Amino acid sequence: MIHAVLIFNKKCQPRLVKYYTPVDLPKQKLLLEQVYELISQRNSSIQSSFLITPPSLLSSGSETINEDIQIIYKNYATLYFTFIVDDQESELAILDLIQTFVEALDRCFAEVNELDLIFNWQTLESVLEEIIQGGMVIETNVKKIVETVDELNRTSNQEARFGNGLGNAFQAITMGGFSNWGARQ
């Protein structure tokens, strides 16, 4: 199972934090900091993208997860894409899933960068939700992921325009009716 997906930059500033296992808020911050410390100290040219972490990090209250927890990450430019998984997941499959995630983001944003993730967080979350739900992988076809997210974005843009039209109509009614409607547009 995938317990968490973390995207953070080289200054430990989170760009996406998604937990699929309940984790207390203070522990979420601690986990992010500890994962950052573990990853940022590694030399990616000679060390692998796989780390084993103590399972106590992902415990919630009296519940403790007894599986071996692994951190699987990939560095792209200034961002670390990090998946925290249990021992039931294949390390290479998760590494490939990170690549799929980044490829889908690249297609949605035309060469994704950190600012895209900051200002378009809804699309970022939509892409992730098309790939993973409830800690389980549901889609890995980049083309299908991008098509679904594009359709979702088109639908939300249409709803936003429709909402603006209603807002303009309401404003026109409250300001004296529709007689000056064309002049205000």
Curated annotation (Swiss-Prot):
SUPFAM superfamilies hit by this protein: SNARE-like (SSF64356)
GO biological process: Golgi to vacuole transport; protein targeting to vacuole; vesicle-mediated transport
Alphabetical UniProt keywords: Cytoplasmic vesicle, Golgi apparatus, Membrane, Protein transport, Transport
Extent of the signal sequence: none
Pfam families: Clat_adaptor_s
InterPro entries, A to Z: AP_complex_ssu, AP_mu_sigma_su, Clathrin_sm-chain_CS, Longin-like_dom_sf
Compartments reported by the entry: Golgi apparatus; Cytoplasmic vesicle membrane
UniProt superkingdom: Eukaryota
GO cellular component: AP-3 adaptor complex; cytoplasmic vesicle membrane; Golgi apparatus; intracellular membrane-bounded organelle
Topology with respect to the bilayer: Peripheral membrane protein
Family: Belongs to the adaptor complexes small subunit family.
Role summary: Part of the AP-3 complex, an adaptor-related complex which is not clathrin-associated. The complex is associated with the Golgi region as well as more peripheral structures. It facilitates the budding of vesicles from the Golgi membrane and may be directly involved in trafficking to the vacuole.
Subunit composition and interactions: Adaptor protein complex 3 (AP-3) is a heterotetramer composed of 2 large adaptins (APL5 and APL6), a medium adaptin (APM3) and a small adaptin (APS3).
Record protein name field: AP-3 complex subunit sigma
Species whose genome carries this gene: Eremothecium gossypii (strain ATCC 10895 / CBS 109.51 / FGSC 9923 / NRRL Y-1056) (Yeast)
Taxonomic path: Eukaryota, Fungi, Dikarya, Ascomycota, Saccharomycotina
